[in-house]
């Protein structure tokens, strides 16, 4: 299944400047997702990272992977929005084995690929990769917690 920005914004609470997913190219709920972030010189972080040699901060690449993984949690097996999506929060609680292979710069299109390794009602584990022009630029294992907003 694919999602445009409207579908993404229905599922994620993030908004500018922290919404780091522009489009979902394919998603198999509970299994995998491929998403895109178009990296523009107009991104606010480029003002200070670095003014004369702009590079996307690695932590934001990992955040984009986490946002892609969150889309799993707010999408049911039929591709619709889960009934409890507005009642739960999704937190990044662990990052292991993060590696950054090359800089991501303005004009790059970041392809984010995430595969579910373990899903439960409260803890999820994923393997994430980010590519530019087919070349691996970053990878990490992510652990996320799902919590009720009523807790």
Swiss-Prot record:
It is found in: Cytoplasm. Its main location: cytoplasm. Its EC number is 4.2.1.59. Transmembrane segments: none annotated. GO terms for cellular component: cytoplasm; membrane. The keyword Lipid biosynthesis applies. Keywords: Cytoplasm, Lipid A biosynthesis, Lipid biosynthesis, Lipid metabolism, Lyase. Involved in unsaturated fatty acids biosynthesis. Catalyzes the dehydration of short chain beta-hydroxyacyl-ACPs and long chain saturated and unsaturated beta-hydroxyacyl-ACPs. Belongs to the thioester dehydratase family. FabZ subfamily. This is 3-hydroxyacyl-[acyl-carrier-protein] dehydratase FabZ. The gene is fabZ.
């Amino acid at each position: 299944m694919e999602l445009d920005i409207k579908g993404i914004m229905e599922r994620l609470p993030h908004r500018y400047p922290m919404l780091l997913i522009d489009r979902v190219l394919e998603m198999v709920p509970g299994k995998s997702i491929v998403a895109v972030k178009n990296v523009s010189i107009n991104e606010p972080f480029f003002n200070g990272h670095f003014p004369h040699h702009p590079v996307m901060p690695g932590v934001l690449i990992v955040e984009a992977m986490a946002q892609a993984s969150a889309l799993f949690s707010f999408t049911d097996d039929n591709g619709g929005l889960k009934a409890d999506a507005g009642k739960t929060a999704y937190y990044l609680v662990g990052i292991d084995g993060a590696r950054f292979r090359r800089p991501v710069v303005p004009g790059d299109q970041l392809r984010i690929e995430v595969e579910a390794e373990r899903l439960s009602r409260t803890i999820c584990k994923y393997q994430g990769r980010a590519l530019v022009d087919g070349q691996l630029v970053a990878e990490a294992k992510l652990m996320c917690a799902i919590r009720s907003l009523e807790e």
